[in-house]
Curated annotation (Swiss-Prot):
A Pfam family: DegT_DnrJ_EryC1
Catalytic activity from the UniProt record: UDP-4-amino-4-deoxy-beta-L-arabinose + 2-oxoglutarate = UDP-beta-L-threo-pentopyranos-4-ulose + L-glutamate
Protein name stated in the entry: UDP-4-amino-4-deoxy-L-arabinose--oxoglutarate aminotransferase
UniProt entry keywords in alphabetical sequence: Aminotransferase, Antibiotic resistance, Lipid A biosynthesis, Lipid biosynthesis, Lipid metabolism, Lipopolysaccharide biosynthesis, Pyridoxal phosphate, Transferase
Pathways involved: Nucleotide-sugar biosynthesis; UDP-4-deoxy-4-formamido-beta-L-arabinose biosynthesis; UDP-4-deoxy-4-formamido-beta-L-arabinose from UDP-alpha-D-glucuronate: step 2/3; Bacterial outer membrane biogenesis; lipopolysaccharide biosynthesis
Job of this protein: Catalyzes the conversion of UDP-4-keto-arabinose (UDP-Ara4O) to UDP-4-amino-4-deoxy-L-arabinose (UDP-L-Ara4N). The modified arabinose is attached to lipid A and is required for resistance to polymyxin and cationic antimicrobial peptides.
Entry similarity comment: Belongs to the DegT/DnrJ/EryC1 family. ArnB subfamily.
Length: 378
């Protein structure tokens, strides 16, 4: 029997392992020089003005919303077709998530869908770049400017993505994820980027106990060990062990993303004619980084549902993923918003299936997945 093919696997090589060993030998393994280097390299690569490394994108969303003063009585517009962490953070802050539907084929929202949901209580919009493609940002930013509303881009899927002529993160405020399955990984980690210095400074303070400095700063700059708390904060800093991995991955990112694109081209060629429906590619100029490759499994066309297809692939030694079950269909939110209806989100949520895609895959692996799909569907 062939080896099991997972839907994702991190592309970790000798350079990443060597970088970790160097940090372990350095005597400084928590937040330190590698963090500062990563933040600077991220800015240099993508044209960001300010970057703050964090232990996760979820942590980044938490402290960013806090820094913007989001709290009870406020509304935050965001898609339900996303990972639940954003919705959880909004809810935990006492604010109200206002769910917006998405385009049925790109799974991204739009200014046209957002506009009717804006009220006097709307304080932020969180559009989601999806699966490696950029949301159509300019109309959303223009809408937000007219109403004086903050925009926080959920760029967890979009490291290395371009929208029109600019990198995601080059302007405005965006949050990236370095989770284990992401295009750039350090096991766990994230990055806030922004062109708002005051926001960056506040996030930097909130991410480390409200001190505004980390342990390395206090030692290297000769500050007193008893740095003062300016405001209550959290411990959301990234260790240098993780930052060292991220630095290597950042240097490799063009190569890793190019391999993903090559694999997707093979999928697109071989899946043509099958009753599966891949996500549509946006029509505006962009560079897609193919974080995920998803198809929709419509029982009326395929003769079986998504869960049955996933089980059949599992039995053939092929892993799949689900990105994502819509947040408002989860138990807590389903009970809190029993009358909420998002037709495009709900149709896709019950049909989405993520096929294997990672840089260490081969074209033969893609052919194996497609052969299994043909066998199952025919």
């Amino acid at each position: 029997m062939q080896d099991f093919l997972p839907f994702s696997r991190p592309a970790i090589g000798d350079a990443e392992i060597s970088a970790v060993c160097d940090v372990l030998k350095s005597g400084w393994i928590t937040t330190g020089p590698k963090n500062h280097e990563l933040e600077q390299q991220f800015c240099d690569t993508f044209g960001c003005q300010h970057a703050v490394a964090l232990c996760s994108a979820t942590a980044g969303m938490h402290v960013t919303l806090l820094a913007l003063g989001i709290g009870p009585g406020d509304e935050v517009i965001t898609p339900s077709q996303t990972w639940v962490s954003t919705i959880n953070i909004i809810t935990l802050l006492g604010a109200e998530p206002v769910f917006v539907d998405v385009d049925p084929d790109t799974l991204m929202t739009s200014a046209e869908l957002i506009a009717p949901l804006i009220t006097a209580n709307t304080k932020a919009i969180i559009p989601v770049h999806y699966a490696g493609a950029p949301v159509d940002l300019d109309p959303i930013l223009a809408l937000a400017r007219r109403h004086g509303i903050a925009v926080i881009e959920d760029a967890a899927h979009a490291v290395g993505t371009r929208y029109r002529e600019r990198w995601i993160g080059a302007s405005g405020t965006a949050i990236f994820s370095f989770h284990a399955i992401k295009n750039l990984t350090c096991a766990e980690g994230g990055m806030l980027v922004t062109d708002d210095k005051a926001l960056a400074d506040k996030v930097r303070m909130l991410k480390f106990h409200g001190l505004g400095v980390d342990a390395f700063d206090r030692m290297s700059l000769g500050r007193k060990p008893q740095a003062e708390v300016i405001t209550p904060g959290f411990k959301y800093n990234l260790a240098d062990i993780n930052a060292a991995i991220a630095l290597v991955q950042l240097a490799r990112l063009p190569e890793l993303n190019a391999k993903r694109a090559e694999l997707v081209a093979r999928y697109q060629e071989r899946l043509a004619g099958l009753p599966l429906a891949p996500l549509a590619v946006p029509g505006y100029p962009h560079l897609h980084t193919w974080h995920l490759f998803m198809v929709r499994v419509d029982p009326d066309r395929c003769g079986l549902d998504r869960d049955q297809l996933m089980q059949a692939l599992q039995e053939r030694g092929i892993g799949t993923g689900l990105h994502f079950r819509a947040a408002h269909t989860q138990k807590y939110y389903r009970e809190r918003y029993p009358t909420l209806s998002l037709p495009h989100t709900e149709w896709n949520s019950s049909r989405l299936c993520t096929l294997p895609l990672f840089p260490d895959m081969t074209l033969a692996d893609v052919d194996r997945v497609v052969a299994a799909l043909i066998d199952i569907l025919e």
